[in-house]
Amino acid sequence: MKTKIKELYVFEGLGKERIKTPVEAGEICAVLMDLDKNVAFEIGDTICDIDNPEALPPIKVDEPTMSMLFTINNSPFFGKEGKYVTSRHLRDRLFAELEKNLAMRIEETGSPDSLLVYGRGIMHLSVLIETMRREGYELQVGQPKVIIREIDGQKCEPIEQLTVLVPEEFSSKVIDVVTRRKGEVGTIDTKGDRVQLDFTIPSRGIIGLRNTLLTATNGEAIIAHRFLEFQPWKGDMDDHKYGALIAKETGEATAYSISKLQDRGPFFIEPGDHVYAGEVIGESLRPGNDIVINVVTAKNLTNMRTKSADEKSTCSPAIKMSLEEAMEYIREDEYLEITPQHLRIRKIILDEIERKRARIAAGYKDE
């Protein structure tokens, strides 16, 4: 196809600038050309000299390795903050994203309110979600799941190349954390006062790994990973060690209630936060067990007490998660509710009795 470049732009800061001089090799630029309306560029196409039409090797876009369920927000706090809250808004926005997000895929779920979105990992999907959040969307997402393929009759999963750079004294901790997630040590190189550790690890082992490593290394770890290939399934990994603290009633959390329940585990909420029944408001210290608690009870007043006495209740600081941390934290029976102003973790089934019935029907013992 013959055409002529009319304008040439280079990127400067957050914008772009038109230039009339040639660009150097390696520079990123944008071009404006006259094109037939029936002709479109594809990823990997080459713009070259008409007298020397030699195309570069085509660029291969990596396939998705992870999926998440995107659905409308149907929590009791639905529609209080967002501008775009309906299934039509959600579907239109996600399908519009397909036009520019080349590594993303969308699959119908059979429900008009939900879509299965495939991406290149937690960070890839979190960028999309954060963008939608800032645009005024309300939505919920499910637990991220890696894509499983059957190759030559064998169950296979995506494997990533993981590189961790840490001070030497933390190297043993890093190896312990990664190998517990089915990671395998590759090479160990010393670079000054730091050690570079290379691993191969299943993509599902990457979920939640960054925060664990930063905690284990006092924030010193530098972490990078990329997709390597599909390999045979590495076996099951340990799930969440602890259960969840679940709100029993809808209302405003009080310092009095939270202070009395500090021994149950750390909280994700603070006094004055509004919660609803079925919301995950903390982490239970009872391994594997969820605990339903009431955090909206206020101190009963008598003629010997005043309302200001409630303010003397002491509470430990709440755990505040980023979007990526919350996406990595949620379990199979939970959703992450995302609004322009809040992130909330909730049980998919909000009603306590219905939740217990579902567990029994699924073969779990009652809590």
Task: Give the role of each language-model region.
Residues 1-68, 78-80, 242, 251-302, ...:
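Conserved nucleotide-binding/hydrolysis modules and their immediate coupling elements
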Residues 2-26, 55-73, 88, 101-114, ...:
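Interdomain boundary/hinge elements
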Residues 35-38, 119-125, 167-171, 200-207:
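Helix N-cap motif at beta-to-alpha junctions
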Residues 44, 70, 121, 167, ...:
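Residue-level signature of catalytic and energy-coupling elements of molecular machines
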Residues 73-86, 162-170:
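Short, surface-exposed ligand-recognition loops at beta-strand->loop->(often short) alpha-helix junctions
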Residues 77-98, 315-318:
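A short, contiguous, amphipathic alpha-helix enriched in charged residues
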Residues 172-185, 190, 208, 212-214:
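Long, contiguous binding/interaction regions
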Residues 280, 284-287, 294-344, 349:
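C-terminal structured "cap/appendage" subdomains that terminate the fold
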